[in-house]
């Protein structure tokens, strides 16, 4: 399935449809925003765990992206940033393992892998970061091209690829 966050489906909606209680989620994304979390928080609170690999080498020096993108003005105007940040922090503390890609390694796309007990798995690969624009919630002029697969063999292959990167200590750090 092709997902463009406009006419051909939205990454956030596809994730919501596949996230189940006790799902295991594995994500590679340049960054992660609290407003992206807010949009999926109902589903994310029910999952078992998340492995989150951030690929933007500058994220440790400049964490401002955590508080949203330029398109997130409507969220910032609600003045509930502190509440959302606290909720996100608590959720990450309970459910997440977070690692970062080494700054010398270039990774130019994002992946989302959902493992469910009933093998109703999903994998999405493309250029949608974990943000409101990347999830297709907030309108943007950016172009997104993502592919979602649900067949067992493809989801297994993409998850295996994620795990190879996740466990590679030469390019990934805690």
Provide a role label for each language-model segment.
Residues 1-174:
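PLD/PLD-like phosphodiesterase catalytic module centered on the HKD motif
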């Amino acid at each position: 399935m092709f997902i463009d966050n406009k006419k051909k489906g939205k990454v956030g909606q596809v994730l919501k449809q596949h996230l189940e209680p006790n799902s295991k989620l594995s994500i590679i994304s340049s960054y992660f925003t609290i407003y992206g979390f807010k949009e999926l928080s109902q589903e994310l609170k029910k999952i078992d765990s998340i492995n989150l690999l951030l690929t933007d080498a500058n994220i440790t020096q400049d964490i401002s992206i955590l508080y949203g993108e330029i398109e997130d003005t409507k969220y910032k105007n609600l003045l509930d940033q502190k509440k959302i940040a606290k909720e996100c922090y608590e959720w990450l503390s309970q459910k997440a393992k977070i690692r970062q890609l080494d700054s010398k390694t270039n990774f130019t796309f994002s992946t989302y892998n959902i493992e469910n007990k009933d093998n109703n798995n999903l994998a999405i690969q493309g250029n949608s970061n974990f943000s409101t624009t990347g999830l297709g919630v907030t309108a943007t002029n950016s172009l997104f091209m993502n592919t979602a697969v649900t067949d067992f063999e493809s989801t297994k292959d993409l998850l295996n690829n994620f795990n190879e990167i996740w466990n590679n200590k030469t390019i990934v750090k805690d």
